[in-house]
């Protein structure tokens, strides 16, 4: 892979931060070293001394004074070593990427910890998107991605999708406007990457099948573009066996994968991780060095302590319990939809994630119905227009989340919505 052609001029100009490099060196230095170089504050001046955090299905996590001093201090930009090590082992267990044993320059698998996967994705976009670049997305698309990409001035080309995710034939038709060799000619402006949420897509709830992923990956090889696999709902797939990931079939080192603990451990701790070819991960870390500097050391240590206590089996056991909860929540929302919205709307049952994507029949644009009328009836959902690059266009869809409401609340919400729809027709 020629990674240089994907890197923006701004990203290519980034150099390692001297102070951040020093932090890395000092973390590996023997304790006998007398450091007069660090700009880190003296931890003895910090007011927080100890903490004990109780854990469901586990022993309390204790931060003694020494651990607390480390937790409150600066740390390495790529992530603390023990968490990086655990996560790399997890990725090998779950995905077994072909690139594990590649040479570093040839796309060897690497990863870094980020302040949630959203930060990681923003760093990826900053690294590879130039104004005018053509990139491939599938609408409806996560609104956070739209708002991250639009200011960068790229051209977002929509690839059609259905309840099984991106339609390969649609992607093939779009790509037919270029020749495979056009990727070597910057003037041809062939697509630089495909962005996709393969499981429980937010907002549509659809999930890519293994067969479609293989077709898409082969097209990526043919036309030489990257795949950004944004998979925050990977640990919320309701049906087993789980479909193989793009990372698991990445023979070329062209997949950048974003994972998150936000949905299964904590959304507020802001711990995510980006996995991909080493030359690109190293460049993402350079972006981190001059922005957030590193994810919260405290949050990383807390998550790391939990994961080492649980082990992989314990963590995946917790994931299964989370899945059981959300499956029941989904089923409750489906029951409410079947009861009240049949004949008034249409939808597909989500196989992952926490969202139901609903199209109201007979109403060209549901924005006013959802934003104003429904809110007056004390039900709150999101109109679908916010998940399209042209948010001003009429849209008959809305997104309903089944993460927090009780089954009784879901039933009441859809009962009220059904009445509003009937009044609006």
Curated annotation (Swiss-Prot):
The organelle targeting sequence, given as a residue range: 1-29
Q: Which cofactor does it need?
A: pyridoxal 5'-phosphate
List every stretch annotated Disordered: 178-208
Q: State which pathway it belongs to.
A: Amino-acid degradation; L-lysine degradation via saccharopine pathway; glutaryl-CoA from L-lysine: step 4/6
* Recorded superkingdom: Eukaryota
UniProt GO BP: 2-oxoglutarate metabolic process; alpha-amino acid metabolic process; biosynthetic process; glutamate metabolic process; kynurenine metabolic process; L-lysine catabolic process to acetyl-CoA via saccharopine
Keywords assigned by UniProt? Acetylation, Aminotransferase, Mitochondrion, Pyridoxal phosphate, Transferase, Transit peptide
The reaction(s) annotated as catalysed by this protein in its Swiss-Prot or TrEMBL entry are: L-kynurenine + 2-oxoglutarate = kynurenate + L-glutamate + H2O; L-2-aminoadipate + 2-oxoglutarate = 2-oxoadipate + L-glutamate; glycine + 2-oxoglutarate = glyoxylate + L-glutamate; L-kynurenine + glyoxylate = kynurenate + glycine + H2O
- Entry-annotated residues carrying N6-succinyllysine: 263, 339
Q: Where is the composition biased (Polar residues)?
A: 198-208
Give all N6-(pyridoxal phosphate)lysine modified positions.
Answer: 263
The residues listed in the UniProt record as binding substrate, with positions renumbered to this chain, are: 20, 74, 142, 202, 399
Subcellular location(s) of the protein = Mitochondrion
Q: Which GO terms describe its cellular component?
A: mitochondrion
Cell division in keyword set: no
EC number(s) from the headed UniProt entry: 2.6.1.39, 2.6.1.4, 2.6.1.63, 2.6.1.7
According to its UniProt record, where is this protein mainly located? mitochondrion
GO molecular function terms here?
2-aminoadipate transaminase activity; glycine:2-oxoglutarate aminotransferase activity; kynurenine-glyoxylate transaminase activity; kynurenine-oxoglutarate transaminase activity; methionine-glyoxylate transaminase activity; pyridoxal phosphate binding
* Sites bearing N6-acetyllysine, chain numbering: 69, 179, 263, 339, 422
Q: Record's SUPFAM superfamilies?
A: PLP-dependent transferases
Subunit and partners: Homodimer.
Summarizing the function annotation, the protein's role is: Transaminase with broad substrate specificity. Has transaminase activity towards aminoadipate, kynurenine, methionine and glutamate. Shows activity also towards tryptophan, aspartate and hydroxykynurenine. Accepts a variety of oxo-acids as amino-group acceptors, with a preference for 2-oxoglutarate, 2-oxocaproic acid, phenylpyruvate and alpha-oxo-gamma-methiol butyric acid. Can also use glyoxylate as amino-group acceptor (in vitro).
Family as reported in the entry's similarity comment: Belongs to the class-I pyridoxal-phosphate-dependent aminotransferase family.
Q: What is this protein called?
A: Kynurenine/alpha-aminoadipate aminotransferase, mitochondrial
Which organism does this sequence originate in? Answer: Bos taurus
């Amino acid at each position: 892979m020629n990674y240089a052609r994907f890197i923006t001029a701004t990203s290519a100009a980034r150099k390692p931060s001297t102070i951040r490099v020093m932090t890395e060196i000092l973390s590996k230095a023997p304790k006998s070293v007398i450091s007069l170089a660090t700009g880190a504050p003296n931890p003895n001046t910090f007011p927080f001394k100890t903490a004990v955090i109780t854990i469901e299905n586990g022993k309390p996590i204790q931060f003694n004074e020494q651990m607390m001093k480390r937790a409150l201090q600066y740390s390495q930009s790529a992530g603390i070593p023990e968490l990086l090590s655990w996560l790399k082992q997890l990725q090998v267990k779950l995905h077994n990427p072909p690139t594990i044993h590649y040479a570093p320059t040839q796309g060897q698998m690497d990863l870094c910890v980020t302040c949630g996967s959203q930060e990681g994705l923003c760093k990826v976009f900053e690294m590879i998107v130039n104004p005018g670049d053509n990139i491939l997305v599938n609408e409806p698309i996560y609104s956070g991605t739209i708002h991250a990409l639009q200011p960068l001035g790229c051209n977002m080309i929509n690839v059609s999708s259905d309840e099984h995710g991106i339609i390969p034939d649609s992607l093939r038709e779009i790509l037919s406007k270029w020749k495979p060799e056009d990727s070597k000619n910057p003037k041809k402006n062939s697509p630089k990457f495909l962005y996709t949420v393969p499981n429980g897509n937010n907002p549509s709830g659809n999930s890519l099948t293994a067969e479609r992923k293989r077709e898409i990956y082969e097209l990526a090889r043919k036309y030489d573009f990257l795949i950004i696999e944004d998979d925050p709902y990977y640990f919320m797939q309701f049906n087993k066996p789980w479909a193989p990931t793009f990372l698991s079939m990445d023979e070329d080192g062209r997949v950048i994968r974003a994972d998150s603990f936000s949905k299964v451990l904590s959304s507020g701790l802001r711990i995510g991780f980006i996995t991909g070819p080493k030359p690109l991960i190293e460049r993402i870390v350079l972006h981190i060095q001059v922005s957030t500097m590193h994810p919260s050391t405290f949050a990383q240590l807390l998550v790391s302590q939990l994961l080492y206590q649980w082990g992989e089996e314990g963590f995946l056991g917790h994931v299964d319990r989370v899945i059981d909860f959300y499956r029941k929540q989904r089923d409750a929302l489906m029951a409410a939809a079947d009861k009240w919205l049949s004949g008034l709307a249409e939808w597909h049952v989500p196989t992952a994630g926490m969202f139901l994507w609903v199209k109201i029949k007979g109403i060209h644009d549901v924005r006013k119905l959802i934003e104003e009328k429904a809110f007056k009836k004390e039900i709150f959902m999101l109109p679908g227009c916010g998940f399209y690059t042209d948010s001003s266009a009429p849209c008959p869809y809305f997104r309903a989340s089944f993460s927090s409401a009780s089954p009784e609340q879901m039933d009441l919400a859809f009962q009220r919505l059904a009445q509003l729809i009937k009044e609006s027709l």
